[in-house]
Amino acid sequence: MYLFINIIRRNFISKNNFPKANREIRAREVRLVGENGEMHGVVNIRKALDMAERASLDLVEISPNAVPPVCKILDFGKFKYESKKRLHEARKKQKIVVLKEMKFKPNISIGDFETKLRKIKEFLKDGDKVKISLWFKGREILHKEVGQELFKRIEVGLEGPIKIDQHAKMEGKQMIMIVSPDIKV
């Protein structure tokens, strides 16, 4: 019973994202790269561990899928710190684009239309994509041309650099258009 639970538990443990180091490396031979980048060729794992120990550094598996695996002698703590720092910087630089939605009805009043249009402009100014959906109820769906006219009014009202990702099209009982800010980098 204990063995069965242990096998199941082992499958659900999250894997460490860092490479194997020192005694965790299971290969018998490795392609060794020295601490200054010099190649030592294919060596026995024990010899590689001894070389790393003499340098007071760690043996880290850089490329585990290579045959034999590529290992480098380096300071593992420093390597982990720099890896986390690079990952943090990459996440910091990436822009998360959010898809906002604005819902309209075919018989919307002018004041409501202008308010929703202003809100769409704010979303676009913040760099978000906007999904504009027009909901038809009952027999309103017979007058799709009203929806087309409304979307034309929206396009005209959205002055400035915008990009229409998806032109107005029907999806079930609603007409959808997706716009995003046209940012030239």
From Swiss-Prot:
GO CC terms, sorted: cytosol; membrane
Superkingdom, taxonomy of origin: Bacteria
Subcellular location: Cytoplasm
Function comment: IF-3 binds to the 30S ribosomal subunit and shifts the equilibrium between 70S ribosomes and their 50S and 30S subunits in favor of the free subunits, thus enhancing the availability of 30S subunits on which protein synthesis initiation begins.
GO biological process: ribosome disassembly
NCBIfam families: infC (TIGR00168)
Gene3D superfamilies: Translation initiation factor 3 (IF-3), C-terminal domain, Translation initiation factor 3 (IF-3), N-terminal domain
Assembly and interaction partners: Monomer.
Keyword Transport: no
Organism the protein comes from: Rickettsia felis (strain ATCC VR-1525 / URRWXCal2) (Rickettsia azadi)
Keywords: Cytoplasm, Initiation factor, Protein biosynthesis
One Pfam family from the record: IF3_N
Family that this chain belongs to: Belongs to the IF-3 family.
MF GO annotations: ribosome binding; translation initiation factor activity
Matches recorded under InterPro entries: T_IF-3_C_sf, T_IF-3_N_sf, Translation_initiation_fac3_CS, Translation_initiation_fac_3, Translation_initiation_fac_3_C, Translation_initiation_fac_3_N
PROSITE patterns: IF3 (PS00938)
Protein name per Swiss-Prot or TrEMBL: Translation initiation factor IF-3
